[in-house]
Amino acid sequence: MITKQNDKKMMESPRFNIRVYGFLIDGGKILVTDEFRLGILMTKFPGGGLKYGEGLIDCLKREFMEELHAEAHIISHYYTTDFFQATTMLPFESQLINVYYLVKVNKPYLFTTTEKKFDFPEIIDGAQCFRWIPVNALSEDQFTFPIDKMIVGRLKNV
């Protein structure tokens, strides 16, 4: 809820956490990433945080190169968060804004996938693996974060 006190606080030091994600869909399946970061096991879509000085597409391309060793080709913008969501993973208050794009990646894929959730050699910070999930089998409970959970219903219509 926006109040005069909150409004004044945000005007003094607005903080936004902007995350950019790609939906890579192939053969009716969508790529997800299982990760262990900041002491949390999480399932989300490939992508990550915007760095100062980056554009949204540059961020997504960097994230795909870092995570998947693949160049993301943007097909289209899919969704940008249009409601308030507080960031829960940072040690300070900020507003989370997620931006999602439909993407393609050249084949053959250079990344490996698994069928088992959290299929890491060991659970250490930065552990990551990728899985394909049939789009028609997506459900909110497969994802960790509120905005990803919300977007799942929309994806079934892609």
Predicted feature residues:
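Acidic, metal-coordinating catalytic segment for phosphate/diphosphate chemistry
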Residues: 1-23, 27
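Short, P/G- and charge-enriched loop/turn segments at secondary-structure junctions
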Residues: 5-12, 87-91, 117-120
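A generic structural micro-feature
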Residues: 12-16, 42, 91-97, 122-127
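Short, well-ordered beta-strand micro-motif
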Residues: 24, 102-104, 131-134
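Conserved Nudix-box catalytic region and its N-terminal flanking loop in Nudix hydrolases
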Residues: 29-66, 70
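Nudix hydrolase/Nudix homology domain
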Residues: 40-43, 110-158
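A short coil-to-beta-strand element that immediately follows conserved catalytic motifs
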Residues: 71-80
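Active-site-adjacent beta-strand/loop module that shapes the phosphate/pyrophosphate-binding cleft
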Residues: 85-115
